[in-house]
Each structure stands twice: as C-alpha cells, then as structure tokens.
C-alpha cells in the first residue's frame, strides 16, 4: 500500500507467473526475452525514448548483485558488515529513523538512496541478503544471500522474482524473524501465514516466480511520463471540501439541527446559500430528500422555510 506519484498508484495491475522446476537464472533469461519481444511488437524496435533517455530492451541485460551495485554507485562496501555498521553508513547519507530498521531494511534504504535511480538501461539486481527476502530460497553458493532479482528500468523497479522458498521449516523461521522485526517497529514486516506454511508442508516443487507491474510496463513501452497516462481510472486528488456553516449558525436562523445535513445534501452548505432561494423551491428540495432517503422527519410548512430565508437575510 504505497502512496501516489508519477510511478505509483494505490491500485495497480500486476502479472504473477510461476514455473515449476526452474530457478531465478532461468527466469532472468525468460524475462529479458519476453520484454524484448513486447518492445518489438509495440514499437517495431527494441528501443524506446522515455523523456531524455533512450532505453534498449534488447537482450541480454546486465546482472549485478545488490551489494556490488551499492559499492559501484556509492563506494560503500556492505559485504560482511554488521547491522550497526550498516546503520552508521545509512545515517551518514541522511537516512532517518534507522533505529527502527533491521539489517535488510537498512540495505534496501541505502540501495534506494544511492543506486536505484541510476539504472536507466534494464539491469537485473540480484542476490539480495536473506533479511530482505523472507520468501526466497537461500543462494546455492553464497551464504547469507538469496536467489532473488529485481529488474530496474529507467531508474524504477519493473519486476521482482525469486527462486521460491519451498522448505516449510526454513520458511517458518523466516516468518518468526519477520515478527521480531515487526516488534522493533518495521511496518513492512510480514505476519506468519499458517495456511501458506501448511501448503508447503504438503509439498511444493522447486519453483521460480515473478511479479511484473503491468502499468509500469505500459509506461515504459509507450514512453509515457506518468502512470496516470496509462490507467483507465487514475486516482485523482480529492476534491476540495465545500465550506459549511456550523449547526449553531443554522440554528441562529431557525433551522433545527436535524435539517442541517438535509440542506447540505441539497447543496446548501452556507446560511447565505438560501438567501436568494424562493421558499417553495427550498421546501421542494428539502422535502424531496426527506422522502427519497426515508428519513421520517415531519416536513416543515412553506412559512417555516420563508422564516429561515428571512432570518438569513437579516
């Protein structure tokens, strides 16, 4: 549940794909071929101009471990660092509220602050620390890392994928660690999903899975500047609320409290809104709402409406 900006919308379309007996290496190869073919189908070429950048979707894409990406872009080498050492680095580059973050969240924030926005050409950021990836299989040859990648294009994440964790014992331990992070104040930590654990206990084959943001994919393939341009019904800024007279102000001209929301429903928000209205028109509007919504109020006589109007004009 994220906010709204040029690349985020509270409601979005996502494609999830799972393939048994495959791993994240296969999924990277599949993804780069898929995007190359989509780009050719949409644009007749493998290149798209997005703002000032020309992005090439021609496979293969660069594959870069996340810790190497941070080192390349910022100069900070986080490999082998303790949580406290990483926290001090995060503080030094201006990241706030670090005391609430675990090791994985700290690395994620440092990557976002120093590296993410710099990857314009499609780049697979791979091999995330286990603290950042509670649903991902451990790396087959790199202790402490997982078989996960995120695809960065034009400075934003387009896809997230893993070799799926299918060991129920390991998964339960990961969930417990997430609960400990939640206790520390991490609002992005996961809760224990007992149904998921039970399903893993029944058995799940080795699997690779990926999620691709379709709205972001549409932005990239069509060269649009914002996500709002590719959504049928984009989230809009809330309308400004009309100013309203208080119940006391309405009472001052003789309007009983129960009729104030009815007047508002009719479009009369301020006492001054009824000054130029004929009593018969006001009666018709107010009594119409009373009837339509079955409020059960005794309708005022036209003389009472006239009295409200006269008082409003004093």
PLM regions with names:
Residues 1-242:
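Class II aminoacyl-tRNA synthetase catalytic cores and aaRS-like
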Residues 239-314:
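Compact, charge-rich alpha-helical regulatory domains located at protein termini
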């Amino acid at each position: 549940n994220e906010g709204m900006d040029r690349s985020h919308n509270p409601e979005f379309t996502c494609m999830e794909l799972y393939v048994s007996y495959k791993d994240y290496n296969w999924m990277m190869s599949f993804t780069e071929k898929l995007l190359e073919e989509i780009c050719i189908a949409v644009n007749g070429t493998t290149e798209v101009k997005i703002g000032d950048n020309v992005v090439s979707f021609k496979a293969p894409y660069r594959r870069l471990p996340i810790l190497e990406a941070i080192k390349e872009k910022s100069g900070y080498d986080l490999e082998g660092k303790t949580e406290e050492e990483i926290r001090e680095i995060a503080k030094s580059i201006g990241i706030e509220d670090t005391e609430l973050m675990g090791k994985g969240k700290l690395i994620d924030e440092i990557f976002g602050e120093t590296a993410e926005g710099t990857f314009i050409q499609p780049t697979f950021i791979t091999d995330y620390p286990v603290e950042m990836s509670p649903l991902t299989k451990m790396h087959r040859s790199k202790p402490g890392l997982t078989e996960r990648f995120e695809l960065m294009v034009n400075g934003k994440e387009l896809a997230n994928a893993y070799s799926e964790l299918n060991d129920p014992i390991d998964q339960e331990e990961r969930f417990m660690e997430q609960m400990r992070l939640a206790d520390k104040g991490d609002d992005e930590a996961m809760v224990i999903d007992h149904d998921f654990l039970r399903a893993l206990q029944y058995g799940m084959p080795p699997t690779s899975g990926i999620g691709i943001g379709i709205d972001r994919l549409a932005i990239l393939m069509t060269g649009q500047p914002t996500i709002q341009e590719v959504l049928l019904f984009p989230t809009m800024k809330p309308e400004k609320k009309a100013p309203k007279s208080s119940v006391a102000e309405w009472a001052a001209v003789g309007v009983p409290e129960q009729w104030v929301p009815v007047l508002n429903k009719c479009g009369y928000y301020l006492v001054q809104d009824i000054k130029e209205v004929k009593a018969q028109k006001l009666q018709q509007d107010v009594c119409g709402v009373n009837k339509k919504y079955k409020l059960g109020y005794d309708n005022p006589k036209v003389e009472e409406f006239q009295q409200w109007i006269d008082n409003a004009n004093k």
